[in-house]
Protein backbone atom coordinates (compact mmCIF):
# COMPACT_ATOMS: atom_id res chain seq x y z
CA UNK A 1 0.00 0.00 0.00
CA UNK A 2 1.28 3.48 -0.89
CA UNK A 3 1.55 4.73 2.66
CA UNK A 4 2.51 8.22 3.75
CA UNK A 5 1.01 10.23 0.89
CA UNK A 6 -2.56 10.98 1.91
CA UNK A 7 -3.50 11.91 -1.66
CA UNK A 8 -2.80 8.30 -2.65
CA UNK A 9 -3.46 6.36 0.55
CA UNK A 10 -7.06 7.36 1.19
CA UNK A 11 -9.79 6.12 3.49
CA UNK A 12 -10.99 3.35 1.17
CA UNK A 13 -7.50 1.82 1.25
CA UNK A 14 -7.33 2.15 5.01
CA UNK A 15 -10.67 0.37 5.23
CA UNK A 16 -9.36 -2.35 2.89
CA UNK A 17 -6.31 -2.85 5.10
CA UNK A 18 -8.51 -3.00 8.18
CA UNK A 19 -10.74 -5.65 6.59
CA UNK A 20 -7.75 -7.93 5.96
CA UNK A 21 -5.88 -7.17 9.18
CA UNK A 22 -4.45 -10.37 10.67
CA UNK A 23 -5.97 -12.35 7.79
CA UNK A 24 -3.18 -11.65 5.29
CA UNK A 25 0.24 -10.00 5.72
CA UNK A 26 0.28 -6.31 4.79
CA UNK A 27 3.41 -4.82 3.21
CA UNK A 28 4.47 -1.20 3.62
CA UNK A 29 5.11 0.41 0.23
CA UNK A 30 6.99 3.71 0.11
CA UNK A 31 5.03 6.91 -0.33
CA UNK A 32 7.41 9.20 -2.16
CA UNK A 33 10.88 8.88 -3.69
CA UNK A 34 13.14 11.91 -3.32
CA UNK A 35 14.64 11.35 -6.78
CA UNK A 36 11.39 10.44 -8.53
CA UNK A 37 8.48 12.58 -9.71
CA UNK A 38 6.43 12.30 -6.52
CA UNK A 39 6.01 15.89 -5.31
CA UNK A 40 5.46 14.77 -1.74
CA UNK A 41 5.70 18.34 -0.36
CA UNK A 42 2.32 19.21 -1.90
CA UNK A 43 0.59 16.34 -0.09
CA UNK A 44 -2.87 17.40 1.22
CA UNK A 45 -1.78 16.64 4.79
CA UNK A 46 0.60 19.61 4.75
CA UNK A 47 3.09 17.62 6.83
CA UNK A 48 5.96 17.32 4.37
CA UNK A 49 8.64 19.87 3.51
CA UNK A 50 10.34 19.98 0.13
CA UNK A 51 13.81 18.49 0.39
CA UNK A 52 12.99 16.64 3.62
CA UNK A 53 12.29 13.03 2.71
CA UNK A 54 12.49 12.15 6.40
CA UNK A 55 9.08 13.80 6.80
CA UNK A 56 7.58 11.27 4.38
CA UNK A 57 9.40 8.38 6.03
CA UNK A 58 7.88 9.31 9.39
CA UNK A 59 4.44 9.56 7.78
CA UNK A 60 4.91 6.11 6.26
CA UNK A 61 6.02 4.70 9.57
CA UNK A 62 3.00 6.04 11.43
CA UNK A 63 0.56 4.76 8.79
CA UNK A 64 2.34 1.40 8.80
CA UNK A 65 1.85 1.12 12.53
CA UNK A 66 -1.84 1.96 12.14
CA UNK A 67 -2.20 -0.67 9.40
CA UNK A 68 -0.33 -3.33 11.44
CA UNK A 69 2.05 -4.11 8.57
CA UNK A 70 4.29 -7.18 8.60
CA UNK A 71 7.14 -5.98 6.38
CA UNK A 72 8.92 -2.89 5.10
CA UNK A 73 9.29 -2.77 1.31
CA UNK A 74 12.87 -1.54 0.76
CA UNK A 75 13.58 -2.28 -2.91
CA UNK A 76 14.47 0.87 -4.90
CA UNK A 77 17.88 2.50 -4.55
CA UNK A 78 16.85 6.10 -3.94
CA UNK A 79 14.17 5.06 -1.48
CA UNK A 80 16.55 2.78 0.43
CA UNK A 81 19.16 5.55 0.55
CA UNK A 82 16.53 7.87 2.03
CA UNK A 83 15.56 5.39 4.73
CA UNK A 84 19.15 4.61 5.68
CA UNK A 85 20.58 8.13 5.41
CA UNK A 86 17.84 10.26 6.95
CA UNK A 87 15.52 7.86 8.81
CA UNK A 88 17.61 4.91 9.94
CA UNK A 89 16.24 5.36 13.45
CA UNK A 90 12.84 4.32 12.07
CA UNK A 91 14.32 1.24 10.38
CA UNK A 92 15.83 0.18 13.71
CA UNK A 93 12.56 0.98 15.44
CA UNK A 94 10.68 -1.24 13.00
CA UNK A 95 13.04 -4.08 13.92
CA UNK A 96 11.84 -3.73 17.50
CA UNK A 97 8.15 -2.98 16.88
CA UNK A 98 7.06 -4.16 13.45
CA UNK A 99 6.09 -7.56 12.09
CA UNK A 100 5.69 -10.33 14.66
CA UNK A 101 7.75 -10.83 17.83
CA UNK A 102 6.67 -14.02 19.60
CA UNK A 103 7.81 -15.19 23.01
CA UNK A 104 6.57 -17.28 25.97
CA UNK A 105 5.57 -14.96 28.81
CA UNK A 106 5.17 -17.78 31.32
CA UNK A 107 5.84 -21.52 31.41
CA UNK A 108 4.76 -23.61 34.43
CA UNK A 109 5.95 -27.21 34.83
CA UNK A 110 6.76 -29.92 37.37
CA UNK A 111 10.38 -30.41 38.40
CA UNK A 112 10.01 -33.95 39.74
CA UNK A 113 8.19 -36.94 38.24
CA UNK A 114 8.39 -40.66 37.53
CA UNK A 115 9.08 -42.32 34.21
CA UNK A 116 5.83 -43.04 32.38
CA UNK A 117 3.89 -40.44 34.32
CA UNK A 118 1.71 -37.83 32.57
CA UNK A 119 2.40 -34.23 33.55
CA UNK A 120 0.95 -30.88 32.53
CA UNK A 121 2.81 -27.88 31.21
CA UNK A 122 1.07 -24.51 31.18
CA UNK A 123 2.42 -21.91 28.77
CA UNK A 124 1.39 -18.41 27.76
CA UNK A 125 2.51 -16.60 24.59
CA UNK A 126 2.59 -12.99 23.46
CA UNK A 127 3.26 -11.10 20.23
CA UNK A 128 5.15 -7.84 20.80
CA UNK A 129 4.91 -6.74 17.16
CA UNK A 130 2.19 -4.83 15.32
CA UNK A 131 1.77 -7.54 12.72
CA UNK A 132 0.93 -11.21 13.04
CA UNK A 133 2.59 -14.54 12.34
CA UNK A 134 0.83 -15.67 9.12
CA UNK A 135 0.48 -19.38 9.86
CA UNK A 136 -3.08 -19.13 8.50
CA UNK A 137 -1.99 -18.65 4.87
CA UNK A 138 -1.92 -21.77 2.64
CA UNK A 139 1.88 -21.74 2.29
CA UNK A 140 2.35 -21.96 6.07
CA UNK A 141 -0.78 -23.87 7.08
CA UNK A 142 0.27 -26.34 9.77
CA UNK A 143 3.96 -25.69 9.12
CA UNK A 144 4.95 -23.93 12.36
CA UNK A 145 3.76 -25.11 15.76
CA UNK A 146 4.54 -24.75 19.43
CA UNK A 147 6.52 -27.70 20.76
CA UNK A 148 7.50 -28.71 24.28
CA UNK A 149 10.61 -30.84 24.59
CA UNK A 150 12.99 -32.45 27.05
CA UNK A 151 16.77 -32.50 26.72
CA UNK A 152 19.09 -34.88 28.59
CA UNK A 153 22.45 -34.01 30.14
CA UNK A 154 24.22 -34.89 26.86
CA UNK A 155 22.17 -32.25 24.98
CA UNK A 156 20.07 -34.87 23.21
CA UNK A 157 16.39 -34.06 22.63
CA UNK A 158 14.65 -37.12 24.04
CA UNK A 159 11.01 -36.01 24.04
CA UNK A 160 8.87 -33.71 21.88
CA UNK A 161 5.21 -32.84 22.27
CA UNK A 162 3.48 -30.69 19.66
CA UNK A 163 0.75 -28.28 20.77
CA UNK A 164 -1.70 -28.60 17.88
CA UNK A 165 -4.32 -26.31 19.39
CA UNK A 166 -1.93 -23.33 19.50
CA UNK A 167 -2.58 -21.10 16.47
CA UNK A 168 0.30 -18.63 16.15
CA UNK A 169 -1.68 -16.40 13.78
CA UNK A 170 -4.13 -15.51 16.57
CA UNK A 171 -1.43 -14.05 18.81
CA UNK A 172 -1.78 -10.33 18.16
CA UNK A 173 -1.38 -7.28 20.37
CA UNK A 174 -3.97 -7.50 23.12
CA UNK A 175 -4.66 -11.20 22.52
CA UNK A 176 -2.23 -13.68 24.11
CA UNK A 177 -2.24 -17.46 23.80
CA UNK A 178 -2.89 -19.61 26.91
CA UNK A 179 -2.46 -23.39 26.80
CA UNK A 180 -2.15 -26.47 28.99
CA UNK A 181 -0.34 -29.39 27.38
CA UNK A 182 -0.07 -32.96 28.63
CA UNK A 183 3.34 -34.61 28.24
CA UNK A 184 3.76 -38.35 28.79
CA UNK A 185 7.15 -39.17 30.27
CA UNK A 186 7.35 -42.68 28.82
CA UNK A 187 10.75 -44.12 27.94
CA UNK A 188 12.72 -41.71 30.08
CA UNK A 189 15.53 -43.03 32.23
CA UNK A 190 16.22 -41.92 35.77
CA UNK A 191 18.16 -38.67 35.74
CA UNK A 192 18.07 -34.94 35.09
CA UNK A 193 16.49 -33.24 32.09
CA UNK A 194 15.86 -29.71 30.86
CA UNK A 195 12.44 -28.47 29.82
CA UNK A 196 12.50 -26.70 26.44
CA UNK A 197 9.88 -24.83 24.45
CA UNK A 198 10.06 -23.61 20.88
CA UNK A 199 8.36 -22.80 17.59
CA UNK A 200 9.18 -25.71 15.31
CA UNK A 201 8.98 -26.46 11.60
CA UNK A 202 6.87 -29.59 11.23
CA UNK A 203 8.30 -30.19 7.73
CA UNK A 204 11.84 -30.44 9.13
CA UNK A 205 11.57 -33.07 11.87
CA UNK A 206 10.09 -30.53 14.27
CA UNK A 207 13.33 -28.62 14.63
CA UNK A 208 13.08 -24.96 15.72
CA UNK A 209 11.89 -23.02 12.67
CA UNK A 210 10.92 -19.58 13.95
CA UNK A 211 13.12 -17.44 16.15
CA UNK A 212 11.54 -16.26 19.38
CA UNK A 213 11.94 -12.82 20.93
CA UNK A 214 13.97 -14.32 23.77
CA UNK A 215 17.36 -13.40 25.25
CA UNK A 216 20.02 -15.46 23.49
CA UNK A 217 21.39 -16.62 26.86
CA UNK A 218 18.17 -18.60 27.37
CA UNK A 219 18.41 -20.39 24.03
CA UNK A 220 19.85 -23.73 22.96
CA UNK A 221 19.85 -24.31 19.21
CA UNK A 222 16.60 -22.36 18.83
CA UNK A 223 14.89 -23.82 21.90
CA UNK A 224 14.15 -21.75 24.99
CA UNK A 225 15.38 -23.41 28.20
CA UNK A 226 12.67 -23.01 30.82
CA UNK A 227 13.61 -25.28 33.73
CA UNK A 228 14.77 -28.62 35.10
CA UNK A 229 13.06 -31.98 35.52
CA UNK A 230 14.29 -34.84 37.69
CA UNK A 231 13.02 -38.32 36.83
CA UNK A 232 12.85 -40.78 39.71
CA UNK A 233 12.14 -44.41 39.00
Where would I find each of the regions flagged by the language model?
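Catalytic cores of secreted or luminal carbohydrate-active enzymes
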Residues: 56-110
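Extracellular/luminal regions of secreted and cell-surface proteins that mediate adhesion/ECM remodeling
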Residues: 95-233
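Generic, low-specificity signal for short hydrophobic/alpha-helical stretches with a mild N-terminal bias
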Residues: 54, 86-89, 140, 179
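Catalytic-core regions of glycoside hydrolase
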Residues: 1-78
Amino acid sequence: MLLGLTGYYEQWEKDFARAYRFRLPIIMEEGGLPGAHHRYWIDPSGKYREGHSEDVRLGEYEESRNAHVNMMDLRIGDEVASWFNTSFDLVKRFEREGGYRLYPTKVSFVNKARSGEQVSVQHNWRNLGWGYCPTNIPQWKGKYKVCIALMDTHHNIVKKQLVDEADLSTWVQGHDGHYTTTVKLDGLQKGSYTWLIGLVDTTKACQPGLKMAVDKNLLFEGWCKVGKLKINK
